[in-house]
Design a protein with these regions (language model features):
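Long C-terminal interaction/binding lobes of large macromolecular proteins
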Residues: 209
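Pseudouridine synthase
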Residues: 111-115, 119, 147, 186, ...
Length: 293
């Protein structure tokens, strides 16, 4: 835990800018997560990013700030080479990568290496995450090259002008297409945090699904979310279709193997007319070809 008392020269500063000033290694995503998960308090009360702080306020941060590690990764040529291998689209304003499974997008209390730290290696640019993928989900991830385009792309996601298409292999046979429209909220089952479907509480979640082919005893599904709730596709497959995603240890009680078969296959940025497709991982293609035999 870090405790700081606001000095005179910081009076009137926004809370998020104050926290960012404490460490050059704090990325935008990590900063937002600190506030979202209530890890920052002002005078004992939960802080919001836009809160104004004043002389004498006590700021407590219930996390470790990854300063030294982040500074080592900024403008690191080896890390940039690693990032370049993932890039599948790039223009002057943003780029897209094919994120591998098992690599987290954002820093966390137990995550010290992730996409957020990799993009710091991009020479002479401050890059910004504009959306997220779960650690075990692979596929298209957009990254802005400046604040202006971070705001623009974030706005397009908010206004549903960026359409996402996922591919998943699920346990069970899905015979027809359909749309799931319900509500999702966080709950705790034992000591484990999970997202659960509810009738009319929580946040609305809408997913369109379509079976593409049988894969042995499984089904290759196309999933198109209209909303971006946490674990939305995983919960909808498990709870509403009764067909949890293969390898999903959180929502599939029969999960086996080391990979989750959920891939962000395609993004269409409608206002720009840009479509970006991410090739399936080898293990995903092998699962399809093996069970077709």
């Amino acid at each position: 835990m870090i405790e700081k008392v606001v000095s005179v020269n910081k009076d009137g500063m926004r809370a998020d800018r104050f926290v960012k000033s404490l460490s050059a290694g704090i990325g935008f995503g990590f900063l937002q997560k600190l506030f979202r998960t209530k890890k920052i308090k002002i005078n004992g009360k939960k802080a919001e990013p836009s809160d104004k702080i004043h002389t004498g306020d006590v700021i407590k941060i219930f996390a470790t700030l990854p300063e030294e590690l982040q500074q080592k990764q900024e403008n690191n040529p080896k890390l940039f080479e690693q990032l370049k291998k993932m890039i599948i689209f790039e223009n002057d304003n943003f780029f897209a990568i094919n994120k591998p499974s098992k690599l987290a997008v954002q820093l966390g209390s137990k995550v010290t290496f992730c996409i957020e730290t990799l993009i710091k290696a991009y020479p002479n640019l401050q890059c910004f995450l504009v959306h997220r993928l779960d650690k075990d989900t692979s596929g298209v991830l957009l990254i802005a090259k400046n604040q202006l385009w971070a705001r623009k792309l974030t706005g397009m996601f908010r206004d549903n002008e960026i359409k996402k298409t996922y591919l998943a292999i699920v346990d069970g046979k899905i015979k027809s297409a359909g749309t799931i429209n319900d509500y999702i909220e966080k709950s705790f089952i034992g000591n484990e945090e999970k997202m659960c479907v509810t009738k009319n509480e929580g946040l609305q979640a809408v997913t369109h699904y379509r079976p593409l082919q049988k894969v042995g005893f499984h089904t290759l599904l196309e999933l198109r979310p209209d909303t971006g709730r946490k674990h939305q596709l995983r919960v909808h497959c498990a709870s509403e279709l009764n067909a949890p995603i293969l390898g999903d240890y959180k929502y599939n009680p029969n999960a086996l193997g080391s990979n989750m078969f959920l891939h962000a296959y395609k993004i269409f940025i409608k206002p720009l007319g840009i479509e970006i497709t991410a090739e399936l991982p080898d293990y995903f293609k092998e699962q399809i070809s093996t069970e077709e035999c």
